[in-house]
């Protein structure tokens, strides 16, 4: 029965502090990128990691001490909370419908996104809104970070449709500040 319960627990509920007073999130040192910056930010939205210490290193001994490790260590192992995407043979995608290879941000969202939403919305992770928001957040935000970090062009060929949505560019940000076509607005604004 324990295995049955364990398999049904979310990844966020499996985080163990292993005698530590404070959890540790580890990522690589040096130049930072959007994928691990987002991955770390998302992880700190989980109650178990809200006050986590951030360690930036490439030292294997320090990496091994991490409660959760993202974007470093050449290991993808959800059961050990290791979320790197740089190793050979890694081709994990969000689900069967998506083709974009996940970055550390996508891996964190895939494994913790529903728990992050539930914590943010202060609702049960079984709330009926969670699956829709989980998918929408990936499609409209996280996937573009995955694509960019993995060097996947938005337009693979001249006549190809976009490989993923990119709604975080400057034009999109400005567009989001304008009223929608069906909203009333005052031209003086």
Where are these regions (language model features)?
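Hydrophobic helix-and-loop "lid/oligomerization" segment in the mid-to-C-terminal part
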Residues: 182-189
């Amino acid at each position: 029965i324990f295995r049955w319960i364990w398999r049904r627990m979310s990844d966020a509920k499996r985080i163990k502090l292993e005698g530590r007073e404070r959890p540790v999130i580890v990522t690589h040192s040096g130049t930072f990128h959007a994928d691990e910056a987002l991955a770390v930010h998302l992880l700190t939205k989980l109650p178990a990691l809200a006050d986590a210490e951030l360690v930036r290193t490439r030292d294997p001994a320090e990496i091994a001490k991490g409660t959760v490790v993202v974007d470093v260590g050449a290991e993808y192992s959800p059961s050990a909370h290791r979320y790197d995407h740089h190793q050979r043979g890694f081709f994990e995608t969000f689900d069967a419908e998506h083709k974009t290879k996940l970055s550390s941000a996508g891996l964190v969202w895939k494994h913790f996104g529903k728990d992050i939403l539930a914590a943010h919305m202060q609702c049960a992770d079984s709330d009926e809104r969670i699956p829709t928001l989980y998918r929408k957040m990936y499609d409209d935000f996280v996937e573009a970070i995955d694509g960019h970090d993995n060097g996947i062009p938005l337009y693979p060929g001249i006549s190809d449709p976009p490989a993923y949505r990119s709604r975080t560019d400057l034009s999109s940000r400005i567009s989001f500040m304008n009223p929608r076509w069906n909203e009333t607005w005052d031209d003086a604004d």
